[in-house]
Amino acid sequence: MSIRHNSRLVAIVDDDESVQSALQDLIESDGLSTLCLGSAEQFLDSEARHKAVCLIADIRMPGMSGLELQAKLKAEGCRIPIIFVTAHGDPEMRTLALGDGAVEFLTKPFNDAVLLEVVHAALERSGND
């Protein structure tokens, strides 16, 4: 769990290490820093909670789900842009996530170019691009 220092840190929260690795390679190839974490609880306990300018998270994970993480951050007044990348493309989950403020809800397998476009749009809207 190391951060390559850059003012634009993207936190990746997914319980699947292969997904973490794929997202990390993609995001870092675009010049952004990353921190990969295996659970929502790890994110909440990490320095990324306060330093990340964008959060990419899975919906279904052991322990706290991505939707529960989003609700907790929102309740605390955290305005980090959240992008959900999930294998579960349930329309109801998508509606819940986007209705609660998520930037985007992408299903796996995702298109690399689309994901990078969404990340940059989120950074631009939050003033971090």
Q: Would you name each region that the model predicts?
A:
Residues 50-56:
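Active-site beta3 strand of CheY-like receiver
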Residues 92, 110-120:
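C-terminal output helix
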Residues 17-35:
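Two-component/phosphorelay signaling modules centered on CheY-like receiver
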Residues 38-39, 65-68:
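Acidic catalytic/metal-coordinating carboxylates
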Residues 61:
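Receiver (REC) domain active-site loop signature in two-component systems and cognate sites
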Residues 68, 89-104:
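Alpha4 helix (beta4-alpha4-beta5 surface) of REC/receiver domains from two-component response regulators
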Residues 76, 87-89:
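Short, conserved "switch-loop" micro-motifs in signal-transduction and mechanochemical regulators
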Residues 58, 86:
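Active-site residues of response regulator receiver
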